[in-house]
UniProtKB/Swiss-Prot annotation:
EC number: 3.6.5.4
CC annotations in GO: cytoplasm; plasma membrane
GO biological process assignments: SRP-dependent cotranslational protein targeting to membrane
Protein name listed in UniProt: Signal recognition particle receptor FtsY
Organism: Buchnera aphidicola subsp. Baizongia pistaciae (strain Bp)
Reaction(s) this enzyme catalyzes, per UniProt: GTP + H2O = GDP + phosphate + H(+)
HAMAP family for the chain: FtsY (MF_00920)
Family: Belongs to the GTP-binding SRP family. FtsY subfamily.
Binding site for GTP: 198-205, 280-284, 344-347
GO molecular function: ATP hydrolysis activity; GTP binding; GTPase activity; signal recognition particle binding
Keywords: Cell membrane, Cytoplasm, GTP-binding, Hydrolase, Membrane, Nucleotide-binding, Receptor
Amino acid sequence: MFKKRVFSWFGFKKNKTKINDLDDHIKKNNQDNLSQKKCNNICSQDSIAKSTKSDCCSENVANSSAVNESHSSSLMKLKLKQHVSHVNNKNSFLLTLTTKLVRTKEAFSIKLKNLFFKKKTYNSLLDDIEEQLLVSDIGVRTTRELVDSLIKVSTQHELKNLNLIIEILKSKMKKILNKVEGPLNINYKNLFVILVVGVNGVGKTTLIGKLAKNYKKKGKSVILAAGDTFRAAAIDQLKLWGEINSVSVITREIGSDPASVVYDAIKIAKLKCIDILIIDTAGRLHNKNNLMEELKKIKRVIHKIDSTISQETMLVLDACIGQNSIKQVKIFHESLNVTGLVITKLDSTAKGGVIFSIAQEFLIPVRYISFGEDFEDIQVFNSNIFVNAILSNNTLK
C-alpha cells in the first residue's frame, strides 16, 4: 500500500526594492536559484516515487496473477474432489441398496431372468412377465403400464433379449418414481417440526432415532417430543434414542394429553432456538376416528402456537404389508394432509414393489427409505438408485 504524497507549492514574495539596487538584485537572483533547486529536487523526488510505484504495481499485478492462478487451480481441484465424492457416494448407495434389498431384487431381477431359460411364445412370455410383476406386489395399474411399454417398444424377436427387456422396464419404472422423488427441504431460519405418524409396528420410533442422528451429523440442533403417552415403553424407547444421540426428550406422565407434550416441546424448542423438533405419536389403526382426531388436535396446537412454523407430516409405511399400504395412505392423507412418506423394512420383504403403486395412486413425496436397524440403514429416496438396485445388472449376467 502506498501513502498519498502531499505536495506543497512554493510561492515567491515580490521584491519591494528598486531594480537598480544591485545588492537587492543579487539577493533576488540567489533566492531564485535556491527556489529553482528546490523545485528540481521536488520534481526529481516525484519522478523517483512514480518510478518506484510503477515497479511495485507491476510486482503486485504479477503476484496477484500468481495468486489468482493458484486459487483457480485449488478451486478446480476442490470441484473435482466434490464430483468424485458425489460419484463415490452414489456408487456406495447403490451397493448398499443392492445388498439390503435382496428379497425385492430377487422378486424382480432373478425370477425375471429365469423366465428366459425356457422357450416361450411371445404371448406366453408377456403373460409370465406380467404375472411376475404382480407377484412382486407392484400393483395392477403399474403392471399393466409396464407390460404395455414392452408391447409398444419390443417386437417378438426383441422380447427374447433379456437385457433389452430390463432396460425398457427400468426406464418406465424410473419415470413413475421420478414423480415422487422429493427430499425434505428444511428452512433452518425458523423451527421446523416433523410430526411422525403411522400404525403400530411400522418403525416410527426407530426412524426418529435415525433422523435425529442424521440431522445432528449435519450440525443441526434437534429435540424430541414423546407424543405417545399411552405406553411407558414408548417413552423409554424414545429416551434411549435421545441419550444415544445426545438430544433432549420432552415427556409427560403416562396418560397425559399428547397435545400438551407437543405444546411444551414447541415452547422449549423456540426458547432454545432449536432447528428441528421431531414428534413421536402413538401407533393407531387408520380406521379409528378418535385417534385420528387426536392427531388433528396436535396439528392445530402447532399452528396455534406459531402459524409461521414449517411443518412436515411424515407417514411411515411398512413395506412388508404390501398393497395394504395403499389404504393407510388414503385414510391418513384425507385426515392429516400427509406431506411426506417413509418406506421401512425394505430389507425384510419381497413386496418392495408397493412403492410403485403408492407413487401411481398418490403424488406424495417419498422422503426416505429404511432397510435395517442400524443408524446407517436409511437413505434419502433416489428413484434411479432404487430402480438400479432392484434390477441390478450383476443379477442378469
